[in-house]
């Protein structure tokens, strides 16, 4: 069993782009989606993710907070493509830019398609209270805002958000 401790932030500006170490292309969908989670019929999301030439099945506890149970299993690329195309209710595509800052790797997710325009920074920590650098481009924390969870972006894509929601000013 693994515990993922992850924090998510909006960005002030594009200054992070000058520090990009590498960029990956991700395509992901959910076998258990936001409707099942919201109704209480499921206690975990089940995600299929393709990242460049690799693929995983991911199971993540539905509870909120920055620490959640998470399990990742490598799967054949062909299986992932078939699941994404045939079994998922929508797919999210994004570019993930890895930006190292003082020994910490920030993952900047730049969403595509109906979520184009949404850019968030994520980082994984070893403990909930672990210190981390706060570069000038790092904005408001949205770790506890359900609106920003990837599983929600399929049913409620960024292109449908109001100006207040896009600014992170409206409760989720």
Residue ranges of model-derived segments:
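Phosphate-end processing signature that detects enzymes handling 5′-triphosphorylated RNA
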Residues: 1-172
């Amino acid at each position: 069993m693994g515990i993922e401790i992850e924090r998510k932030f909006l960005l002030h500006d594009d200054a992070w782009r000058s520090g990009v170490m590498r960029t990956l292309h991700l395509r992901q969908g959910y076998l258990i989606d936001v409707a099942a989670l919201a109704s209480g019929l499921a206690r975990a999301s089940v995600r299929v993710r393709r990242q460049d030439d690799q693929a995983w099945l991911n199971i993540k506890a539905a509870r909120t907070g920055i620490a959640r149970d998470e399990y990742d299993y490598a799967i054949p690329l062909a299986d992932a493509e078939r699941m994404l195309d045939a079994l998922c209710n929508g797919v999210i595509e994004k570019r993930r830019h890895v930006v190292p800052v003082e020994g910490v790797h920030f993952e900047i997710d730049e969403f595509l398609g109906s979520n184009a325009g949404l850019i968030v920074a994520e980082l994984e920590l070893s403990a909930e209270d672990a210190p981390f650098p706060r570069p000038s481009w790092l904005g408001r924390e949205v770790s506890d805002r359900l609106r920003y969870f990837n599983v929600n972006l399929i049913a409620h894509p960024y292109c449908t958000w109001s100006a207040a929601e896009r600014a992170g000013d409206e409760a989720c």
